[in-house]
């Protein structure tokens, strides 16, 4: 029993060392705050456009939100999830993350009950078609996964099965987003950099939201106009300028 316990401790320590080795750089916040934010980026993207990413970090901290930059040679999504949970348990507590560049994508099996319209026979169709790509892998800590394998053609796709011990509903501990390029080769770095510069510029503008376009899929709430009334009122309450300008469209 004691030997098994020692082996378990050793394996956990070994995983920690491996994960730590894949993190090539951590840039800590320059300000203090009640919560924090983190930018996760692959090392190649950071080496190409580090100046713009640092400026993006600066623009976030100008809004009084402490910001980390975590750079790594990511091998598994688990590495990133582990680091996110560690930041969440630290002070100031992590409130959100953004993934920039080539960040691994978790392709989840046995998770179709979390989706609204994705229904496919997992036994009949190949993994790449019948798995659910989801960043809930990173931002919902009550979901538990078992690693299956890596995709044979797309180096960013990693397959996991959702374990029965997972929560039956989605309740994210943090928010997350991706800045993922659509172009290939060197052009993808230029595309990310262009977007970051646009975000930095917009953050400096004083431009209150006065027009709001709302849309939904065909058949949503059975196309009932009455069902939309409360939603419209909530948008007017959340975005008062739209009411003044008659700027809500749906």
Model-inferred region functions:
Residues 1-23:
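Bacterial Sec-dependent N-terminal signal peptides
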Residues 21-250:
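Cysteine-dependent hydrolase recognition
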């Amino acid at each position: 029993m004691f030997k098994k316990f020692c082996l378990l401790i050793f394996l956990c320590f070994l995983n920690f060392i491996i994960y730590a080795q894949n993190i090539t750089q951590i840039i800590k916040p320059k300000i203090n705050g009640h919560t924090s934010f983190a930018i996760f980026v692959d090392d190649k993207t950071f080496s190409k456009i580090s100046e713009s990413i640092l400026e993006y970090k600066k623009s976030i901290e100008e809004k009084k939100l402490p910001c980390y930059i975590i750079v790594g040679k990511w091998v598994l999504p688990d590495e990133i999830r582990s680091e996110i949970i560690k930041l969440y348990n630290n002070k100031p507590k992590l409130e959100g993350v953004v993934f920039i560049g080539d960040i691994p994508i978790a392709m989840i099996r046995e998770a179709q009950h979390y989706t609204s319209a994705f229904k496919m026979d997992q036994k009949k169709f190949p993994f790449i078609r019948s798995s659910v790509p989801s960043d809930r892998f990173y931002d919902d800590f009550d979901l538990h996964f078992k690693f299956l394998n890596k995709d044979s053609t797309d180096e960013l796709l990693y397959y996991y099965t959702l374990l029965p011990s997972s929560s039956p509903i989605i309740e994210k501990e943090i928010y997350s987003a991706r800045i993922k390029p659509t172009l290939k080769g060197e052009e993808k770095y230029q595309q990310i950099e262009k977007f970051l510069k646009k975000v930095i510029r917009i953050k400096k503008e004083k431009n209150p939201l006065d027009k709001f376009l709302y849309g939904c899929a065909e058949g949503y709430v059975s196309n009932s106009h009455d069902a939309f009334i409360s939603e419209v009122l909530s948008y007017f309450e959340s975005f008062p300028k739209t009411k003044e300008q008659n700027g809500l469209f749906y």
